[in-house]
């Protein structure tokens, strides 16, 4: 379900403060965030965020194509190791 237009995009307040501070300082450090539910705004383009996936912070470099998506979309939480193979087909 899509969010109402009249509400606007959701962004954590602390995330805006961290992004503004990073822009003002001019440093290109990874900004650690835990808010996977926040929407990526145009003012975040060019910054690198460390999005927490439950184990570690995954570095995500923001570009123009990511605007409007959520941070959590770019930091997978589950690891797929593949299905086990059939023993008959491996025998050859």
UniProtKB/Swiss-Prot annotation:
<comment type="similarity">
    <text>Belongs to the universal ribosomal protein uS19 family.</text>
</comment>
<comment type="function">
    <text>Protein S19 forms a complex with S13 that binds strongly to the 16S ribosomal RNA.</text>
</comment>
<dbReference type="InterPro" id="IPR023575">
    <property type="entry name" value="Ribosomal_uS19_SF"/>
</dbReference>
<dbReference type="Pfam" id="PF00203">
    <property type="entry name" value="Ribosomal_S19"/>
</dbReference>
<keyword id="KW-0689">Ribosomal protein</keyword>
<keyword id="KW-0687">Ribonucleoprotein</keyword>
<keyword id="KW-0699">rRNA-binding</keyword>
<keyword id="KW-0694">RNA-binding</keyword>
<dbReference type="InterPro" id="IPR020934">
    <property type="entry name" value="Ribosomal_uS19_CS"/>
</dbReference>
<dbReference type="GO" id="GO:0003735">
    <property type="term" value="F:structural constituent of ribosome"/>
</dbReference>
<dbReference type="GO" id="GO:0006412">
    <property type="term" value="P:translation"/>
</dbReference>
<dbReference type="InterPro" id="IPR005732">
    <property type="entry name" value="Ribosomal_uS19_bac-type"/>
</dbReference>
<dbReference type="GO" id="GO:0015935">
    <property type="term" value="C:small ribosomal subunit"/>
</dbReference>
<protein>
    <recommendedName>
        <fullName>Small ribosomal subunit protein uS19</fullName>
    </recommendedName>
</protein>
<dbReference type="InterPro" id="IPR002222">
    <property type="entry name" value="Ribosomal_uS19"/>
</dbReference>
<dbReference type="GO" id="GO:0000028">
    <property type="term" value="P:ribosomal small subunit assembly"/>
</dbReference>
<dbReference type="GO" id="GO:0019843">
    <property type="term" value="F:rRNA binding"/>
</dbReference>
<dbReference type="GO" id="GO:0005737">
    <property type="term" value="C:cytoplasm"/>
</dbReference>
